[in-house]
């Protein structure tokens, strides 16, 4: 009997993009179900009653929540394809450290670029650039964060890359000028079929931001 895999997601979510990419990397067929986050569906509320957030991966009726946990789950359930996490315990721990760093740091500062104004906006932009520089330092001259192999940390971060042009537009700055190696890394990642299929067009994200502000009641002149 074939596995039933359902993904409850929202197209601009950089967290959902992670799960899409992980599934694509493993060639796992899945039923993508777009969610309205302002009118949450019964299945989303049933499958993630604690946080009521996307993405939710449903495997044979069992929900798995939180995107980084989903990447690990996918890697363990479908191990035959190229592993997403290193087998070495230390390298695995390091990958998880950087995944956690991305989760805790990147979104919070990036959100201030399009969702705040004045001093808060400028502080968010400054912190965001500093965070990207920290990540660029970890990347160094490697092809991917894990070396020559695309994996966990790349998947954790690459969804934000689809938002980079929006951050630049609403923040009036150039990420490439600040972090050229990180931009080169993003371009390499997008050449992968799994990433290209999973990331939305940057222009679509830019057009979505004013709509998102309106939905959230954010007024920025």
Swiss-Prot record:
Keyword set includes Phosphoprotein: yes
SUPFAM superfamilies (alphabetical): GST C-terminal domain-like, Thioredoxin-like
UniProt xrefs under CDD domains: GST_C_Tau, GST_N_Tau
Annotated compartments: Cytoplasm, Cytosol
Residues with N-acetylalanine modification: 2
S-S bridge residues: none
UniProt-recorded name of the protein: Glutathione S-transferase U25
Name of the gene this protein is made from: GSTU25
């Amino acid at each position: 009997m074939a596995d039933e895999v359902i993904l409850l997601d929202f197209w601009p979510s950089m967290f959902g993009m992670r799960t899409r990419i992980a599934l694509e990397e493993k060639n796992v067929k899945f039923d993508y179900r777009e969610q309205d986050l302002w009118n949450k569906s019964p299945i989303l509320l049933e499958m993630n009653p604690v946080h009521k957030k996307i993405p939710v991966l449903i495997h044979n009726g069992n929900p798995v929540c939180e995107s980084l946990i989903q990447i690990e789950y996918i890697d363990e359930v479908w191990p035959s394809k190229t592993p997403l996490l290193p087998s070495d315990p230390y390298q695995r721990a390091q990958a998880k450290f950087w995944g956690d760093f991305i989760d805790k740091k990147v979104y919070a500062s990036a959100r201030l670029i399009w969702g705040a104004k004045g001093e808060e906006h400028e502080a968010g932009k400054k912190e965001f650039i500093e965070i990207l520089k920290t990540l660029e330092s970890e990347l160094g001259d490697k092809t991917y964060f894990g070396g020559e192999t695309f994996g966990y940390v790349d998947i954790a971060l690459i969804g934000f890359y689809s938002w980079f042009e929006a951050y630049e537009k609403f923040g009036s700055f150039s990420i490439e000028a600040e972090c050229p190696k990180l931009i080169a890394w993003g371009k390499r990642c997008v050449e992968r079929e799994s990433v290209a299929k999973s990331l939305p067009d940057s222009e679509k994200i830019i057009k979505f931001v004013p709509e998102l502000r309106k939905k959230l009641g954010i007024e920025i002149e």
